[in-house]
Amino acid sequence: MIIFLGAFILLLCISTPITVALGGCSLVYALVGGTVPITTLIQTTFGGLTSFPLLAIPLFMLAGNLMNEGGLTPDLVNFARHLLGHIRGGLGHATILACAIFAAISGAAVATAVAIGVVMLPAMKKAGYDEGVAAALTSTAACLGPIIPHSIPFIIYGVSANVSIAALFVGGVFPGIVLAAALMVYMYFVAARHDYPRDPKKSWKETLLTAGKALPALFMPVLIMGGILSGMFTPTEAAGVTVVYSAVMGAFYYRQLNFKNLPKVFLKSGLESGMVMLLIAMSEPFAWFVAADQIPQLIIDWISQVTTSPYAILLLINAFLLLLGIPMETAPALVIVTPILVPIGAAVGIDPVHLGIVVCLNLVLGLITPPVGAVLFAVCGMSGMTLDRLSKAIWPPFFVALVVLAVVTYLPWLSTYLPRLVLGR
């Protein structure tokens, strides 16, 4: 165990890519330990990619890129603005709503921040919003991407923990709504304090017209969740249906998707999904060695000497994951901690669906935690703000998200009620 963990920490300290660190420490352990044949290392590496649910990752990524390239974002933002723009802080509310809807299409925080931010950041700045407030709100609202179904982190966690992906998708609905609502309340008071302008109230006829134009984007979450909950298709099959739907809408409804931009979409989707799949492949022998060395059991024994309270353990998990999420991206952090945390949660009676949503929400907040949050870098690139300025502006909405994290952590029914109601688990 010392050789295994020592090799992993050493590789991380010398800035080795996380995939190389995961595979490298497993290889060192197999070679030096001498108790595990190399064939086991190879079998677990390739075996990790044979899981049928993993096929949903590249398909959902492709669907999101097809819809984004197909030109849905302007119509989606226009609908959100018509619906909420007349409320105090309306542009901020429209940004949150647009992020929530796009989250159900992309399943990723950075993609949500880029797609919505490129439209809404200039609009808020033009309307007189403080640039820091606008950028910080967009960054935090982008965290809805991996929480509202569908969600790439939920798929990774579900496969790693052997938990129903459909249950995770359904369980993420209420936490996503709570986070969106909390950010809207925050934006309302910020707008009242700074007297931000409102858009003129639109008639219902105008709003319905914009809703009609955005209908393909609005219907996609219904298609995904409706098909899964009705038993029409599995989450993986839903991803395939979504790809076909996105391609048809982009080509024939929005008419911006053609053979010229398809290679760019395929290349981008291939690179994004390839990185995730390689990470998962390298994590499989890592998880196997973690289980073989009984590392989760050692941690459970140590924690049980301190406390056996699920609430205290959830607090420790939150603190650990918030710190881990600062230097590490969501996907690699998930494949490392899931094999360790799931047995710990099971030992104290924490529902695995609830634990999965808490883990994912924690790690997603790492994407907006200074100084190395990936979403912060993306928003800085779009807005032209310095990272230092955005790092200062991010704290108020970040603390709102922390409050939501506490609520989701200690009110488990927010994550488990819907799965039990509609899936019977």
Located regions from the model:
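Alpha-helical transmembrane segments of multi-pass membrane transport proteins
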Residues: 1-425
